[in-house]
């Protein structure tokens, strides 16, 4: 049975977006493995506390990710 793990910084994605991720990631797995795998495909969303995520040797707070996300959307 497929297991998909997704790690996100807490506070960047809302519940609706996380549900959409689960649906679309499951759909992607089913596209590869076949429809019979849908019922046994697990998708786990883990949220890492803001600031406990690091990149380039520095902690990355949710606010920094949201600012970048909003800049791309503009």
What are the roles of these predicted feature ranges?
Residues 2-74:
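A domain-level signal for the structural core that forms small-molecule/cofactor-binding pockets
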């Amino acid at each position: 049975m497929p297991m998909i793990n997704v790690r996100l910084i807490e506070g960047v994605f809302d519940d609706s977006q996380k549900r959409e991720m689960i649906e679309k990631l499951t759909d992607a797995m089913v596209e590869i493995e076949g429809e019979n795998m849908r019922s046994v495909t697990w998708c786990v969303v883990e949220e890492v506390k803001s600031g406990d995520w690091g990149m380039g040797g520095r902690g990355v707070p949710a606010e920094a990710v949201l600012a970048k996300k909003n800049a791309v959307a503009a």
